[in-house]
C-alpha cells in the first residue's frame, strides 16, 4: 500500500469514548491557600428569592409522583386492570401533540393565560382517575394530564428564573429542582396514608387540592412579577 494511503485500524467506540474523557483540559489555577471547594456555598446552591416557586413545585411534583406510585395498584386492586401503561402512553402522546400549541399560547398570551387552563386540565385528569371505571377513563385521564403537565411545568420554570437576577439563574434552577425532589419524597408518604385510610379514589381526588393551590399561588407570583417589571 502506498505511504499516502495508510489508515488507522478500526477501533471500538469505547476507545474513542475513553479518549474524549481523558483528553487534557485547561483547569483554572487556584490561588495559594484557596480550597478547591471554596465556591461551594449555600448561597450559590440555593436561591431564597425562588422559595415561592419551590413551594409550588413541591405541590405539583408531589401530585405527579403520587399518580405514578399509586395508579397501577389502584387499577389492579379495584378494577382488575393489569396493564395500565396505556395511561402513560396517552399522556406522553398528548403532551407531544399539545406542546407546540402550549408554547404558542405562552408566547402570545403569557404565562398566566397558559397556567390556568393547564391547571384545569390537570385537575380534570385527576378527577377522571378518582371516578375511573374502566380503561377508557385512564386514557381520558392520561390525555388531560398530558396537556396539563406540559402547560404547567414550563411556566413554573419561568417563574423560578424571573425571581432572580441573571447571575443567580443556576441557583434558582437548583432551588426549583429541590422543590421537585421534596415533593416526590412527601407524595409517597402522604399519598400512602391517604390511600390507606380513605382509599385510592379519595386519594386521587385529594391531589386536586395541591394542584389548585399551586396554580393559584403561581398566578399571584406572576401578577406581582409583571407589575414589578412594568413599574421598573
Enumerate the language-model features and the residues they cover.
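Structural signature of the two symmetry-related core transmembrane helices
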Residues: 9, 113-128, 208
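Helix-to-loop junctions at the C-terminal end of transmembrane segments
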Residues: 98-110, 195-196
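C-terminal membrane-cytosol helix-exit motif in multi-pass small-molecule transporters
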Residues: 4, 9-29, 217-222
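A membrane-interface helix-boundary motif in multi-pass transporters
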Residues: 1-10, 193-211
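Conserved extracellular-gate-facing transmembrane-helix segments in secondary transporters
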Residues: 56-68
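Juxtamembrane intracellular "pre-TM" segments in multi-pass secondary transporters
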Residues: 22-57
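Short amphipathic helix-loop junctions that connect adjacent transmembrane helices
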Residues: 69-83
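Intracellular juxtamembrane helix-capping segments at the cytosolic ends
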Residues: 151-164
Amino acid at each position: 500500500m502506498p505511504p499516502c494511503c495508510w489508515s488507522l485500524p478500526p477501533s471500538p467506540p469505547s476507545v474513542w469514548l475513553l479518549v474524549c474523557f481523558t483528553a487534557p483540559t485547561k483547569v483554572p489555577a487556584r490561588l495559594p491557600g484557596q480550597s478547591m471547594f471554596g465556591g461551594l456555598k449555600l448561597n450559590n446552591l440555593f436561591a431564597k428569592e425562588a422559595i415561592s416557586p419551590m413551594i409550588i413545585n413541591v405541590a405539583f411534583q408531589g401530585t405527579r409522583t403520587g399518580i405514578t406510585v399509586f395508579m397501577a395498584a389502584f387499577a389492579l386492586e379495584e378494577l382488575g386492570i393489569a396493564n395500565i401503561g396505556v395511561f402513560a402512553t396517552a399522556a406522553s402522546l398528548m403532551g407531544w401533540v399539545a406542546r407546540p400549541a402550549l408554547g404558542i399560547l405562552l408566547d402570545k398570551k403569557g404565562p398566566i393565560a397558559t397556567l390556568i387552563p393547564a391547571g384545569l386540565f390537570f385537575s380534570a385528569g385527576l378527577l377522571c382517575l378518582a371516578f375511573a371505571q374502566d380503561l377508557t377513563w385512564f386514557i381520558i385521564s392520561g390525555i388531560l394530564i398530558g396537556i396539563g403537565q406540559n402547560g404547567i411545568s414550563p411556566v413554573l420554570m419561568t417563574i423560578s428564573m424571573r425571581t432572580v437576577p441573571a447571575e443567580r439563574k443556576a441557583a434558582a434552577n437548583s432551588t426549583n429542582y429541590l422543590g421537585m425532589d421534596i415533593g416526590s419524597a412527601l407524595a409517597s408518604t402522604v399519598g400512602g396514608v391517604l390511600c390507606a385510610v380513605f382509599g385510592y379514589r379519595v386519594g386521587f381526588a385529594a391531589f386536586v387540592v395541591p394542584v389548585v393551590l399551586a396554580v393559584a399561588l403561581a398566578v399571584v407570583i406572576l401578577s406581582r412579577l409583571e407589575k414589578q417589571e412594568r413599574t421598573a
